[in-house]
């Protein structure tokens, strides 16, 4: 009996010591960083950090606009192979965000922000030089290129979050960060179209590499120095804090699962390795879940997740998968079906920058007067309406009818869903896991774009009669997007109703208590 008591007491002491260590680690995340002291310095500071979002979306736009120009240089016309130009990039952006955020927490956010831009610069340059190689090397460069934004986004958000206290200034800075996304996509599309059409497409990637190098150097100088988080090697192992086992199994599972979905339309699902990789990827994700449930410092703490988290992430996954389908096939529709040049198509997409900025400002106002669940419902509706408009647009219809309205509407889905989801997750998570909210949203956004393209590509390859009827394939892919965003509306409406009923119940209980 005494032996059992001593063992129990020893376990309690060990658990208490572990909790103290974890509290020490988590307290490091709450440190307030020094804000730049002058307006000029602060403007440069915010500009460099917002460039993380801008360059991330520019990386997506630079492959979509000159898609066929790049494909022709490699002798590629298959839609499934072309979709890899965008999906390989989004795959790694979504896969590595959680790991990048954890590394930033341990080794310093500024360090990994700067390294992210250097990495982005290197693989942008190599993507341009892939013109001398083949499409497979270009796809690999795009995948490695996407790891740069994966390190930029969570660390930029963490730096901003630690620098600004809650208030109007912080809301303004985060609104600017969100508004950079549509503008970044437009800039990437315009410059890559112009260079691809009038000069040589690799120049878009070489210029991107130079710009990222300049931003890396700028980030080193304009981001204030922050003290390195303390790491007591005698207290806990570094690999345990990084969650090495969870990171490896999670990355392998996500990559294999996504690769199978995007490669299936290219080689056909009857090819054995496609469904084999899908099964193996799922197996690794199951192992990842098992490891995370027992890890001391889990990359994805299941204890912090709730039914509210599932609702929010389901909405984001459905809406942004729909967005990925919309933007990829709208570009194909403009260039293939309507015979437009990449530069003209980019010009027609220019309203996304203005509409996105208006959406970001409006969302900031709505979130202070309307429940985030209602804003999320509006966002899912925007995704659905925008996709319906382009899916039913006749080929020879004027741009100013359905296409223009669709391009105006879709940024509202983008810029309303992201901040609403971040706030909703933040409200539903414990204080010590606040940094996880934005990282989770970013992960699901980018991974869903890539998966959505894989699902749509499978549908397109089944209905376009071997490429003889491309328009039929585009429309059926859009219909899939409508189904996904419609599912988002259903989930958002259910969540909004559930939130309303919970609020009503709390008010009723409070009144009953007062009486």
Curated annotation (Swiss-Prot):
Cell location: Cell membrane
Induction pattern: Expression is induced by neocarzinostatin. Expression is induced during G2 phase of cell cycle. Expression is slightly up-regulated upon exposure to boric acid. The AMF1 promoter contains 8 predicted enhancer box (E-box) transcription factor binding domains.
Ranges of the Cytoplasmic topological domain: 100-111, 162-171, 224-241, 292-310, 368-374, 425-435, 501-515
Membrane topology (Extracellular): 1-78, 133-140, 193-202, 263-270, 332-346, 396-403, 457-479
Keywords: Ammonia transport, Cell membrane, Membrane, Transmembrane, Transmembrane helix, Transport
Membrane topology field: Multi-pass membrane protein
Chief location: membrane
GO molecular function, one term: ammonium channel activity
Domain of life: Eukaryota
One Pfam family per UniProt: MFS_1
A GO CC annotation given for this chain: cell periphery
Phenotypic effect of disruption: Does not affect boron tolerance. Impairs methylammonium (MA) transport and toxicity.
GO BP, one annotated term: ammonium transmembrane transport
Transmembrane spans: 79-99, 112-132, 141-161, 172-192, 203-223, 242-262, 271-291, 311-331, 347-367, 375-395, 404-424, 436-456, 480-500
Record InterPro entries: MFS (IPR011701), MFS_dom (IPR020846), MFS_trans_sf (IPR036259)
Cell membrane found in the keyword field: yes
UniProt similarity note: Belongs to the major facilitator superfamily.
Entry function: Low affinity ammonium transporter of the plasma membrane. May be involved in drug resistance through pumping them out of the cell.
PANTHER family: LOW AFFINITY AMMONIUM TRANSPORTER, MAJOR FACILITATOR SUPERFAMILY MULTIDRUG TRANSPORTER MFSC
Protein name (Swiss-Prot/TrEMBL): Low affinity ammonium transporter
Taxonomic lineage: Eukaryota, Fungi, Dikarya, Ascomycota, Saccharomycotina
């Amino acid at each position: 009996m005494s032996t059992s008591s001593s063992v129990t007491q020893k376990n309690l002491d060990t658990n208490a010591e572990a909790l103290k260590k974890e509290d020490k680690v988590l307290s490091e995340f709450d440190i307030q960083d020094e804000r730049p002291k002058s307006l000029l310095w602060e403007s440069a500071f915010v500009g460099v950090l917002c460039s993380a979002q801008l360059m991330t979306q520019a990386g997506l736009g630079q492959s979509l606009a000159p898609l066929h120009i790049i494909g022709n240089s490699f002798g590629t016309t298959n839609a499934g192979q072309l979709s890899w130009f965008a999906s390989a990039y989004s795959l790694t952006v979504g896969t590595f965000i959680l790991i990048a955020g954890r590394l930033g927490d341990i080794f310093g956010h500024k360090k990994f922000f700067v390294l992210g831009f250097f990495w982005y610069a290197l693989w942008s340059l190599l993507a341009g030089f892939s013109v001398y190689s083949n499409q497979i090397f270009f796809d690999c460069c795009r995948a490695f290129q996407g790891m740069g934004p994966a390190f930029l986004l969570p660390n930029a958000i963490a730096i901003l979050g630690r620098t600004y206290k809650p208030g109007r200034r912080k809301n303004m800075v985060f609104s600017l960060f969100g508004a950079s996304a549509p503008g970044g996509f437009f800039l990437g599309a315009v410059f890559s179209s112009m260079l691809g059409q009038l000069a040589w497409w690799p120049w878009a990637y070489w210029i991107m590499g130079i710009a990222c190098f300049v931003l890396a150097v700028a980030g080193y100088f304009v981001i204030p120095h922050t003290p390195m988080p303390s790491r007591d090697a005698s207290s806990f192992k570094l690999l345990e804090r990084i969650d090495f086992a969870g990171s490896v199994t999670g990355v392998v599972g996500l990559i294999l699962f996504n690769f199978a979905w995007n490669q299936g339309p290219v080689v056909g699902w009857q090819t054995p390795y496609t469904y084999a990789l899908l099964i193996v990827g799922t197996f690794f994700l199951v192992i990842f879940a098992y490891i995370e449930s027992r890890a001391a410092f889990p990359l994805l703490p299941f204890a912090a997740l709730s039914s509210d988290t599932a609702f929010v992430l389901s909405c984001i996954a459905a809406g942004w998968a729909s967005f990925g389908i919309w933007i990829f096939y709208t570009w194909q529709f403009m260039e293939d079906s309507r015979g437009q040049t990449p530069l003209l198509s980019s010009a027609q997409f220019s309203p996304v920058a203005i509409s996105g900025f208006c959406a970001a400002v409006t969302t900031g106002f709505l979130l202070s007067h309307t429940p985030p669940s209602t804003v999320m419902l509006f966002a899912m509706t925007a995704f659905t309406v925008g996709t319906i408009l382009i899916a039913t647009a006749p080929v020879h219809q004027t741009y100013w009818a359905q296409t223009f309205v669709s391009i105006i509407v879709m940024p509202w889905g983008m810029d309303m869903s992201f901040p609403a989801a971040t706030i909703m997750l933040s409200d539903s998570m414990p204080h010590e896991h606040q940094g996880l909210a934005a990282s989770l949203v970013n992960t699901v956004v980018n991974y869903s774009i890539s998966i959505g393209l894989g699902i749509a590509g499978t549908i397109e390859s089944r209905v376009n009669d071997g490429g003889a009827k491309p328009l039929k394939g585009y429309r059926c892919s859009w219909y899939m997007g409508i189904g996904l965003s419609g599912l988002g509306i259903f989930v958002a409406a259910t969540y909004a109703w559930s939130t309303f009923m919970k609020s009503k119940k709390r008010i009723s209980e409070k009144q009953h208590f007062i009486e």
